[in-house]
Amino acid sequence: MSSQPAADDVIGCLAAVYDWAESFDTKDWDRLRTVLAPTMRIDYTQVMGKIWESMPADDFIPLASDPKFLGNPLLKTQHFIGASKWEKTSDDEITGRHQVRVAHQRYADSGMKEVAKKGHAHGGATTWFKRVDGVWKFAGLCPDIRWSEYNYDEMFGEN
């Protein structure tokens, strides 16, 4: 089955992807937990060289919130999602394809006045959604970084 999803289904997926992005950018890991499917496909090949075909949501939260990744309190991000296309792949699964720009700034200290490093990624992302108990949940992502600005490759880890 591959078809255009109903408008209500797309709206449900848009709500989930919005909350996913806002959760990342505000570091609101409790909010993130509310929109995740129980298991997820995480293809971070271009981000950290790893892929998880079936990651429990309870494992994704510590990955995302790790201080060496998005949980760094000195790191500010904006996951901006542009135009999207949607494909219904089963009664309870939808795939989204999006234009994406993710801005990153890491500050020198907790005063958040001096930018120590910045790096922005441009490209797309494939996202997956599953309907769980009648609600569309964020079930994974695969960023496609086509190009980057500044020091994107230095945004994460011990740098």
Curated annotation (Swiss-Prot):
<dbReference type="GO" id="GO:0030411">
    <property type="term" value="F:scytalone dehydratase activity"/>
</dbReference>
<protein>
    <recommendedName>
        <fullName>Dehydratase GME11372</fullName>
        <ecNumber>4.2.1.-</ecNumber>
    </recommendedName>
</protein>
<dbReference type="InterPro" id="IPR032710">
    <property type="entry name" value="NTF2-like_dom_sf"/>
</dbReference>
<comment type="subunit">
    <text>Homotrimer. Each subunit contains an active site, located in the central part of the hydrophobic core of the monomer, which functions independently.</text>
</comment>
<dbReference type="InterPro" id="IPR004235">
    <property type="entry name" value="Scytalone_dehydratase"/>
</dbReference>
<comment type="pathway">
    <text>Secondary metabolite biosynthesis.</text>
</comment>
<dbReference type="Pfam" id="PF02982">
    <property type="entry name" value="Scytalone_dh"/>
</dbReference>
<feature type="active site">
    <location>
        <position position="79"/>
    </location>
</feature>
<dbReference type="GO" id="GO:0006582">
    <property type="term" value="P:melanin metabolic process"/>
</dbReference>
<dbReference type="InterPro" id="IPR049884">
    <property type="entry name" value="Scytalone_dh"/>
</dbReference>
<keyword id="KW-0456">Lyase</keyword>
<feature type="active site">
    <location>
        <position position="104"/>
    </location>
</feature>
<comment type="function">
    <text>Dehydratase; part of the gene cluster that mediates the biosynthesis of dibenzodioxocinones such as pestalotiollide B, a novel class of inhibitors against cholesterol ester transfer protein (CEPT). The biosynthesis initiates from condensation of acetate and malonate units catalyzed by the non-reducing PKS pks8/GME11356. Pks8/GME11356 lacks a thioesterase (TE) domain, which is important to the cyclizing of the third ring of atrochrysone carboxylic acid, and the esterase GME11355 might play the role of TE and catalyzes the cyclization reaction of the C ring.</text>
</comment>
<comment type="similarity">
    <text>Belongs to the scytalone dehydratase family.</text>
</comment>
